[in-house]
Amino acid sequence: MLRGAIWDLDGTILDSMSAWDHVGENYLRNQGIEPEPDLDEAIATMSLHQAADYFIEHYGVKQTRDELIKSAVAIVDDFYRYEAQLKPHLKEFLAQLHETGVKMCIATATERSLVEAALARCRVLDYFSEIFTCSSVGAGKDEPTIYREALNFLGTDRPNTMVF
């Protein structure tokens, strides 16, 4: 029986993948740096902290990690605050899970302020008891850390917890 649900945000809850398609490229070009053709693949599973470190080490970006993250978040900020939409029929599904007592949280690479803004605007934030970000757990989604922390927070057992 389903007791817990750990949700990804971009492309699962929100139709928001396109917002991130060229953030890295746009950021580097704004800095006067031409990105390599495989940049999107290189940073796809990285947290913002990991991507910032990669840009500093690989491209010689002069901003600090925090400055770089702030610049990247600013590129997508308006999209999350004013445009990002829920995937079709998701609101009804979340309501159904909530009504049956399924505990839910989010595990995402997106910064918390953007997650909260979009979900509050879409009126689904209250369905989730916590938001775990790669930045807050200190690891990208290519590692199990974020999912383990989410599972521990929910207090549900693995066989009865679904990752969406």
Regions found by a protein language model. Give the residues of each.
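A structure-centric signal for secondary-structure junctions around beta-strands
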Residues: 1-2, 158
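N-terminal helical cap/lid subdomain that shapes the substrate entry/recognition surface
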Residues: 2-100
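Conserved G/P- and acidic residue-centered "switch" motifs that form tight phosphate/ATP-binding loops
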Residues: 8, 12, 108, 143
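Substrate-recognition "cap/lid" segment bordering the active-site pocket of phosphatases
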Residues: 105, 111-164
